[in-house]
């Protein structure tokens, strides 16, 4: 009996000790990352405003690209695979995210947005979060298991501070690494780091990438509108898979045609500049949050999501930095907005469904997608978001933005597959 009591005391001591440790560590690291993310957010807002006030600065995009390639080369990070490296680090004991990544990705993303590259900034968030977490783990002499947990918590913090969706930020790093397996050991650290980081960003009045969107027109779920949601979900799955194919093939062929990274980045920049002057609009440059917001009120043109794909592929595949998730939200919102005319459905609910549907298709993260929907659009349309996310997740197959993402369990049957995404 005494032996059992002793074991129980030891078990409770370990549990409460672990809770205290992770609350303190994740709270401090989340607050620190919140400060970095807030500064980064203000930098992106400033460079975007400067670009919009001085549109001809886009002619400097090739020079910006050359600077980015040079910075990665002199720091020995020219082979850095970005977010794919982060996914590998969490699964493997052999890789790590070096400290150099934080200044490199933040500066490179700011340069990309200053000169008009079409990209997001969540790639930067996940990478600098993982980099900070890795450095902290080293200085704190954490073991390999705790290091991976603190990296996930740091990713949650960065995502939360920039996107303003802390609940989605908690789940995304745990869900995106290996589809079908959740890293629940990181749940407590991810929760406290995400909310600490968001608290700092709110305190500093950071403008998030995705402000809440008002969805007023929610149809009756038990009607023909639920069938329309399935049709929209199919479109989201197809477009999401297409976006992944365009990005991966774009990277492959640009490397094949332009083996020299300096020539490659100039070629990509030239493509963006030519398209910009041909179309005479800056709607596809930078984050494109203005277009996302407009998609909820006005019907988007059928070409908009396709052009955003093209601009983003030329930018990121050439060697510029930022991320693919905000472009995927742009693509989803404009696709949904356009589909609203075909489906004879309200524009705002279709744009919202399009955003979460394409996000789910390209990340294979259905739980995160639903949490994003709840935090951005509220719960009124949740039955529609559930349908769109579920169908889009299934029909997008094994495509993903991230080549190092793994599908652990099949999407169509209860079967262990453990395969890399396409």
Spell out what each predicted region is.
Residues 1-422:
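Alpha-helical transmembrane segments and immediately membrane-proximal extracytoplasmic
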């Amino acid at each position: 009996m005494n032996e059992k009591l002793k074991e129980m005391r030891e078990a409770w001591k370990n549990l409460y000790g672990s809770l205290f440790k992770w609350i303190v560590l994740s709270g401090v690291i989340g607050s620190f990352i919140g400060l970095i993310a807030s500064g980064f957010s203000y930098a992106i807002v400033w460079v975007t405003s400067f670009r919009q006030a001085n549109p001809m600065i886009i002619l400097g995009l090739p020079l910006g690209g050359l600077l980015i390639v040079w910075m990665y080369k002199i720091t020995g990070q020219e082979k850095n695979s970005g977010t794919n490296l982060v996914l590998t680090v969490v699964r493997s004991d052999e890789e790590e995210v070096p400290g150099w990544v934080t200044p490199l990705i933040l500066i490179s993303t700011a340069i990309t947005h200053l000169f008009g590259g079409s990209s997001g900034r969540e790639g930067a968030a996940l990478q600098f979060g993982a980099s900070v977490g890795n450095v902290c783990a080293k200085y704190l002499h954490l073991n390999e298991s705790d290091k991976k947990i603190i990296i996930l918590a740091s990713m949650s913090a960065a995502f939360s501070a920039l996107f303003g969706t802390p609940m989605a930020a908690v789940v995304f790093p745990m869900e995106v690494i290996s589809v079908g397996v959740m890293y629940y050991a990181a749940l407590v650290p991810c929760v406290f780091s995400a909310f600490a980081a968001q608290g700092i960003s709110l305190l500093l009045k950071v403008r998030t990438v995705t402000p809440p969107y008002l969805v007023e027109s929610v149809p009756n779920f038990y009607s023909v509108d639920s069938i329309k949601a399935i049709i929209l979900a199919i479109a989201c799955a197809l477009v999401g898979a297409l976006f992944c194919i365009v990005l991966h093939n774009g990277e492959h062929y640009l490397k094949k045609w332009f083996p020299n990274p300096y020539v490659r980045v100039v070629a990509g920049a030239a493509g963006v500049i030519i398209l910009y002057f041909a179309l005479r609009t800056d709607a596809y440059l930078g984050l494109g949050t203005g277009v996302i917001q407009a998609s909820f009120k006005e019907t988007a043109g059928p070409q908009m999501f396709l052009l955003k794909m093209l601009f983003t592929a030329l930018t990121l595949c050439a060697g510029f930095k930022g991320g693919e998730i905000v472009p995927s939200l742009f693509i989803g919102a404009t696709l949904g907005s356009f589909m609203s005319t075909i489906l004879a459905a309200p524009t705002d609910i279709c744009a919202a469904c399009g955003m979460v549907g394409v996000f789910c298709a390209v990340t294979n993260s259905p739980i995160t997608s639903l949490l994003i929907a709840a935090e951005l659009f509220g719960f009124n349309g949740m039955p529609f978001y559930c349908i769109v996310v579920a169908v889009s997740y299934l029909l997008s197959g094994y495509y993903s933005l991230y080549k190092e993402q793994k599908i652990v369990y099949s999407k169509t049957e209860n079967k262990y597959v453990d395969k890399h995404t396409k």
